[in-house]
UniProtKB/Swiss-Prot annotation:
Disulfides per UniProt: none
Organism: Ovis aries (Sheep)
Name of this protein: Translocator protein
Family statement drawn from the similarity comment of this UniProt entry: Belongs to the TspO/BZRP family.
Mitochondrial intermembrane side: 1-5, 68-79, 127-134
Cited InterPro entries: TspO/MBR-related_sf (IPR038330), TspO_MBR (IPR004307)
GO CC annotation, single: mitochondrial membrane
Subcellular location per the Swiss-Prot or TrEMBL entry: Mitochondrion membrane
Gene3D superfamilies recorded: TspO/MBR protein
Membrane topology label: Multi-pass membrane protein
Subunit structure of this chain's protein: Interacts with TSPOAP1. Interacts with MOST-1. May interact with STAR.
Lineage, opening ranks: Eukaryota, Metazoa, Chordata, Craniata, Vertebrata
Keywords associated with the record: Lipid transport, Membrane, Mitochondrion, Receptor, Transmembrane, Transmembrane helix, Transport
Transmembrane segments: 6-26, 47-67, 80-100, 106-126, 135-155
Amino acid sequence: MAPPWVPAVGFTLVPSPGGFLGTQYIRGEGFRWYASLQKPPWHPPRWILAPIWGTLYSAMGYGSYLIWKELGGFSKEAVVPLGLYAGQLALNWAWPPLFFGARQMGWAFVDLLLTGGMAAATAMAWRQVSPPAACLLYPYLAWLAFAAMLNYRMWQDNQGRRSGRRLSE
């Protein structure tokens, strides 16, 4: 049997590989394209994004562990709270290919709205099971709201730059 800390570490790390794979769209031509876009003055500096996402992914991952543990693993009761979590995580991972890969800022904005809605539903479901787990999602919800505003503003400010390109660079 695995030591008791293994599930906590495993769940905490689950969101990170998808986030890491998403960074592949931000390299090379994707980065050059992004650098050429008009950005609002409140656009965050590039260096802060990795620490922010690392923290948010770790918090949501650990929150999912708390839910899993509280509900006795992958039980019938865990289907909705962990299913909502998995759904919002899949939507989260879809954003970089949409924005940077396909260069579809409008569809990326829709994806962020859906991600935010699913993440809010996840937080509400988690609150019924473990209020501390739900609290771990609150910074993520705030960041998603900020990211949606930024995505929308960039989409509107770069009207001529929103046509799609190939997904692979």
